[in-house]
Every structure is written in structure tokens, then in C-alpha cells.
């Protein structure tokens, strides 16, 4: 059985070497869908009876391990030195420094790496 839980969050970023609008500072409303596969629990009297995993637990783990950190943060590549210097000059600014350029593909791969071990 597969189950999916969708969460949304807002973050800013830029793709520094891109040739179009993406090189400018901007933000998105991101959606992450977490799909888990497993057997349905068949345990009479258990609060998990009939579930693969409690949806509230899926949400809690995602928030603790990814969403709360990235929500309303600016995701910046470590190599984007001008932007990184600027963001570091802002007191209390929520900045997440990444080892990769924050493209949708790289963010998806990072999210998978962070969350895959959480749900095992």
C-alpha cells in the first residue's frame, strides 16, 4: 500500500548563473509530497490499526527534519559569495546555506536525502 502526504512551504532563492529571470532573487510556494509504502497494520485495539503510518506522524517528521528549516528561509548556494555576504549582513535573517545551486531538481534531491532516512 502507498500513502502520500503533501506539505507546502515558502522559500526564496536564485540561480546565480542562469540566463533568464531565475538569476534574480525571488521566492516560491513549494510543495513536497511524501509517499511511503508498506503493509497496512492489522492489529486490533492499536491506534495504528488499518494504517501504513499515521498521517500526523508523517507531517511531524517532515516538519522537524525539513519544512520548518526551509519555510520562510532564503536557500543560497555556498558558491554564491556576493549573495551569501549580503544575507549574512542581515541580523537574524533565516538563511540556509546549501552545497548545491538551489534548483528544483537539487532541492528535491536534498529533500529526499534528508527525509529518506527519517522514514526508514
Give each language-model segment a name.
Residues 1-120:
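Charge-rich, low-complexity N-terminal segments
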Amino acid at each position: 500500500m502507498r500513502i502520500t502526504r503533501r506539505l507546502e512551504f515558502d522559500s526564496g532563492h536564485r540561480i546565480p548563473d542562469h540566463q533568464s529571470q531565475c538569476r534574480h532573487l525571488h521566492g516560491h510556494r513549494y510543495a513536497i509530497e511524501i509517499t511511503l509504502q508498506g503493509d497496512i497494520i492489522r492489529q486490533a485495539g492499536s491506534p495504528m490499526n488499518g494504517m501504513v503510518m499515521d498521517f500526523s506522524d508523517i507531517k511531524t517528521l517532515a516538519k522537524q527534519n525539513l519544512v520548518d528549516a526551509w519555510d520562510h528561509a532564503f536557500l543560497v548556494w555556498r558558491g554564491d559569495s556576493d549573495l551569501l555576504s549580503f544575507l549574512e549582513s542581515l541580523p537574524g535573517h533565516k538563511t540556509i546555506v546549501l552545497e548545491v545551486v538551489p534548483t528544483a531538481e537539487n532541492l528535491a534531491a536534498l529533500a529526499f536525502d534528508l527525509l529518506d532516512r527519517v522514514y526508514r
